[in-house]
């Protein structure tokens, strides 16, 4: 978990009676198996952070629990979403929606909190949820690092030269 995730938790705690955080690294969101294998995993540390934040529930499902026989690994998306990130990460949004669908069918939560950093993903999820669930999708402000980059689990994979280039656009 990073400060962006912590901000989402705190936003939830401000407006909800109970807070549930799910931690699931979704293999269907990754185009390359090496990206999935190299994705940062810090479960023990993350749970300690969530305990400190006094989160009510932490859900850490395994792949079999998410992808049971009746759960699709991907949910088709309209081609209008296959631009920007959707163009360069084929299958990513379809995998995201499959897990969102599973969670919301199972958990029946009133709200989910997403960061504006992933605006295209937020927009897609918001429209998907609006058509199928009574859950409100809450958009939360992007939290930035000292380098002005938004916090992201993938930032560990970015070299200094790339950070300097990215700073010109933030």
Regions found by a protein language model. Name each.
Residues 1-170:
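Nucleotidyltransferase catalytic core that binds NTPs
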């Amino acid at each position: 978990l990073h400060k962006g995730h912590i901000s989402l938790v705190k936003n939830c705690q401000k407006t909800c009676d109970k807070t549930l955080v799910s931690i699931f690294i979704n293999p269907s969101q990754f185009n390359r198996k090496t990206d999935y294998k190299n994705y940062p995993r810090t479960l023990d540390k993350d749970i300690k952070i969530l305990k400190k934040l006094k989160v009510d529930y932490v859900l850490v499902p395994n792949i079999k629990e998410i992808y049971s026989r009746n759960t699709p690994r991907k949910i088709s998306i309209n081609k209008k979403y296959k631009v920007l990130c959707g163009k360069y990460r084929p299958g990513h949004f379809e995998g995201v929606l499959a897990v969102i669908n599973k969670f919301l069918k199972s958990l029946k939560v009133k709200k989910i909190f997403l960061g504006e950093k992933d605006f295209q993903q937020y927009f897609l999820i918001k429209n998907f949820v609006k058509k199928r669930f009574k859950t409100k999708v809450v958009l939360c402000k992007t939290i930035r690092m000292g380098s002005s980059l938004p916090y992201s689990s993938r930032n560990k994979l970015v070299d200094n030269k790339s950070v300097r280039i990215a700073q010109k656009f933030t």
